């Protein structure tokens, strides 16, 4: 460990889900080291705990291979600046939270400069581009994985990895309170609601807002009394979604909420959502869901050629079988989405609810504390 009396941690979180994980890790580290300093790139939750952001987190919130290329010069400039600043800071440890295409390159440079590095959230090496594990081994002293099957993959390749579970599984109660969520959001206690979550990034809304809005029109035909509620992460995303609504379904009423995505999902009877961490939250609040995703055709062709698995949503990956419908790319049409949502809203939910509860228990491990303990073991380990 550094001889400094104050521990210093450099961290980079790339998006909303990383901010949640980063804040949980910070809080756990602050319990035993209240004067620890945290510097790098973080979001509002991390900043509320005293995190010092050198750049806005939005800089890294880019989706898709093609989409990243247009932002590459700026991303490289940010990374070069971080390498310089973090090297000068000489932190006790660097923790890259998710954002693997950005963070692993950063970790590689920092590790070569003698800084201990941790990657929090395993990249999906088991799903696509499995050879990345060799770069991860070179770039990190340890990986913190959220999902149990990931550790087995790292163990097989003799790469240090600690399974910590998922903070969402710790935070979300085993029994979610629909009535309380509706009261909080001022929604009708007795109406049937479908939550629509088209993603938190601009690129996601660009791809998904139109088919989701058009699907809602078709769903309304099957369920005339159904109501729709959509959480948007900020005003920019709200403006984007409102434009899609105006363009494609001007007469459709959708109740919009800023933030509060978990409360919206809890309040709903069913959920239509983009693939990503939100699918895990939907599973943990135990609601029937339809998962859809679409990227640019070129991004999809490149990604498909590298895929090692046939599933992409977290509930299905965790279960090791198809428990929720997935509609990707050409299947992400209003007609197919509406048909899938109709089936899910009409089905017997009891077997799926039991499966979701089993998966919830599996991920409930006090993740932030386990992650903090693993980081501190590394910090206290002497080099060589």
Curated annotation (Swiss-Prot):
Q: Which domain of life is it from?
A: Bacteria
Gene Ontology molecular function terms on file: lipid-A-disaccharide synthase activity; phospholipid binding
Q: Name one GO biological process term.
A: lipid A biosynthetic process
Per its UniProt record, what InterPro entries does this chain match? Glyco_trans_19
State the pathway, as annotated in the record.
Answer: Bacterial outer membrane biogenesis; LPS lipid A biosynthesis
Per the record, its GO cellular-component terms are: membrane
State the reactions this protein catalyses.
a lipid X + a UDP-2-N,3-O-bis[(3R)-3-hydroxyacyl]-alpha-D-glucosamine = a lipid A disaccharide + UDP + H(+)
User: What keywords is this UniProt entry annotated with?
Assistant: Glycosyltransferase, Lipid A biosynthesis, Lipid biosynthesis, Lipid metabolism, Transferase
Q: EC no.? A: 2.4.1.182
Briefly, what is this protein's role?
Answer: Condensation of UDP-2,3-diacylglucosamine and 2,3-diacylglucosamine-1-phosphate to form lipid A disaccharide, a precursor of lipid A, a phosphorylated glycolipid that anchors the lipopolysaccharide to the outer membrane of the cell.
The family assignment reads: Belongs to the LpxB family.
Its name, as the record gives it, is: Lipid-A-disaccharide synthase
């Amino acid at each position: 460990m550094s001889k400094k009396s104050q521990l210093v941690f450099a961290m980079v979180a790339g998006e909303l889900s990383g901010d949640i994980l980063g804040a949980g890790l910070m809080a756990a580290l602050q319990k035993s080291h209240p004067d620890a300093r945290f510097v790098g790139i973080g979001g509002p939750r991390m900043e509320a705990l005293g995190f010092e952001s050198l750049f806005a987190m939005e800089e890294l919130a880019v989706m898709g291979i093609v989409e990243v290329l247009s932002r590459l010069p700026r991303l490289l400039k940010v990374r070069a600046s971080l390498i310089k600043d973090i090297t000068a800071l000489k932190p006790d440890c660097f923790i890259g939270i998710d954002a693997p295409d950005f963070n692993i390159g950063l970790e590689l440079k920092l590790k070569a400069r003698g800084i201990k590095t941790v990657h929090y959230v395993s990249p999906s090496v088991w799903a696509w581009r499995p050879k990345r594990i060799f770069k991860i081994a070179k770039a990190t002293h340890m990986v913190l994985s959220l999902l149990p099957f990931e550790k087995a993959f790292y163990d097989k390749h003799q790469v240090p990895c600690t399974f910590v579970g998922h903070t969402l599984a710790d935070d979300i109660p085993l029994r979610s309170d629909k009535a309380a969520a509706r009261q909080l959001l001022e929604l009708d206690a007795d109406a049937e609601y479908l939550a629509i979550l088209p993603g938190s990034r601009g690129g996601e809304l660009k791809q998904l807002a139109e088919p989701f809005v058009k699907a809602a029109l078709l769903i309304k035909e099957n369920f005339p009394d159904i109501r729709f509620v959509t959480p948007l992460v900020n005003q920019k995303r709200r403006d984007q979604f409102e434009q899609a609504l105006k363009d494609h379904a001007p007469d459709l009423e959708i109740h919009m909420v800023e933030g509060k995505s978990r409360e919206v999902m809890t309040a709903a009877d069913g959920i239509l959502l983009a693939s990503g961490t939100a699918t895990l939250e939907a599973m943990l609040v135990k609601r029937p869901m339809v998962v859809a995703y679409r990227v640019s055709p070129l991004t999809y062709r490149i990604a498909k050629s590298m895929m090692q698995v046939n599933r992409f949503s977290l509930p299905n990956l965790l279960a090791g079988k198809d428990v929720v419908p997935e509609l990707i790319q050409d299947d992400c049409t209003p007609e197919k989405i509406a048909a899938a949502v109709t089936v899910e809203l009409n089905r017997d939910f009891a077997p799926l609810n039991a499966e979701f509860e089993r998966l919830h228990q599996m991920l409930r491990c006090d993740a932030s504390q386990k992650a903090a303990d693993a980081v501190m073991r590394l910090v206290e380990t002497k080099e060589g």
